[in-house]
């Protein structure tokens, strides 16, 4: 009821194509899937395709976002976890990112420049700390038990929402001052490549 979709039949394990232009492409997937039809006013993210071609979409979405109370509610109608662990197709990441952006259009922190960065926001003594953790590596490769080298990220563009202009932005542990701009209750700056872990 809250999702405002109609469920069609029962869920089943099938092989099909899914994605879309906003997801950066179409990816093949074999997984458990529930067909649904969105009602009027429901936002759709991604579609199921009969072929790996934008000309052949079905009427079934990958995910939907619907207004609910003062916020929004979203759902994916297929299990992408196993497929992601096996294929690591960026289409899966993009679909999830797009849904999160629809739910949280103005996040506290935005990081662009790499898909392999985990961000942890902390606050202490009226200061904000952004932990940038390089998460690259063969985490999902069962044949790799350990590795001793990570690929550095590229430079990262970061925007952070704050109601007051900070006195300074520093990169730790080096203490390097980072140039930043402040406009519209957001600061924007660029962080040099992260080898393992950096703090701003």
Go through each PLM region and give its residues.
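A conserved amphipathic helix/loop scaffold
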Residues: 1-200
